[in-house]
Every structure is written in C-alpha cells, then in structure tokens.
Amino acid sequence: MAEKKPSPGQRLPAAERREQMLNAARIVFGERGYTGATTDAVAKAAGVSQAYIVRTFGSKENLFVETVSRAVDKTIEVFRTAAQGVESPQELIREMGHAYVKLVADRGILLTMMHLFTMGHHERFGQLARDEFMRIYRVLHHEIGMSPKATEKFLAKGMLINTVLGMRLTDVMKTDPDIQELLACIFTQEETESLAELAKLHTPLPPAARGRTSL
C-alpha cells in the first residue's frame, strides 16, 4: 500500500516525519532486503533527503533495526488485540490467525520480517533475529497463555503463511488447481478472496512467472 507523502512545501512535525521515513523503510527493505536497500532509496520513497535519513537514524544498520523491531511490535500488537476477550483455545487460534493474515497482507511488514528471520548468520542482525522471534514466542506463551505445543503449531502456520505470501502464490492461484487446494487448507474462503483482491494491486508478475511449473 502506498504511503501518503506531504504536498510540496508542507512541513510535517518531527514525529510524523519519522513515522513517514519508517513506513518508507519498511517498503524498501521489504522489496530489496538489507543488502539491496540504500538510505537514498528510503529517502526518495519518504520524500526527504538522504542526509535527513542519516541525521535521524545515524546509519542504514540503525534504520533497519528500528524498522524490523517495529514490524515485530505491530505483529505483537495484533496478537494482543485479537486475544482480548477470547476464552476458548480454538477461538483464540482462529482470531489471531485471521488478524495475522490481515497484517501480513502488508508486504512491507511481511517481507521485512522474512528478511530478518533469514539473517541468523549476520554479525549484528543474527542475535536481533533470534531475540525478536523469541519475543513473539514469549508473548504468545507467557502473556496470552498458549501452551508451548500450541505456540509451536501457531508459529509454524505463520511461517507457512509468510512463505506462501512471499512467493505470491495468491497472485497465480487461478493457474494451478494444486495451488488452490493448498491455499484452501491455509486460509478461510474470506481470507483467500481478500488476498486475491490485494494481489491485483501488486506489480504484475512477468508472463514466464505466471505459468504452472511441472517436474
């Protein structure tokens, strides 16, 4: 989803401008990953100068850390909200799962977290990835009250959702009945229809990427 930019000559309060830069960073890091992203690309997406980005965050590393941490913050906030007032374990899983699907329809959040969780080898970001993943686990288990096994199953389903949406399978589901069958096992009918509508807003896949692949 495109972020709103200020009109020419309009000045935003510092807090709003920071939010604007972090929203832009989420999109740029999501699309390009940490290595491919640049502070210049984030600056252009946010409608500010590169110098302003660096002055605000200090470095690309610091910007990435804050961006991914905020993505995890949003994820945890969604889980907490969905869990409020829910009593049965089955309803809890259903409500939080539905809320998560709606959240990661934002590809910036989805892909930024996916990039982070593949960086366990990274000198600086490896520990961050482990800490943020376990932060989610601890909220689900210790705060919301899910059992360790239920939490494991929920996280596994979440990672499957991440993979399916990251590959943009919902964009090409009409081309392959097996994809439709898989998606029907993962998402509700309402979720599938919603994701299909969102897929129409994506940059179209190249024709060669839309056909069915066979071995």
Model region roles, listed by residue range:
Residues E66, E77-R107, T203:
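Hydrophobic alpha-helical connector segments
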Residues L12-R17:
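Short, Lys/Arg-enriched anionic-surface-contact patches
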Residues M1-K5, L215:
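Short, intrinsically disordered or compositionally biased N-terminal tails of bacterial proteins
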Residues E91, E95, A99, T112-H115, ...:
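Amphipathic alpha-helical interaction segments
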Residues S69-T75:
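Short, basic, alpha-helical segments at the C-terminal edge of helix-turn-helix-like DNA-binding modules
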Residues E123-M134, L140-L215:
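Hydrophobic/aromatic-rich alpha-helical bundle segments in the mid-to-C-terminal region
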Residues Q20, A24-N62, E66:
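Helix-turn-helix
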Residues V104-E123:
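Amphipathic alpha-helical segments used for helix-helix packing
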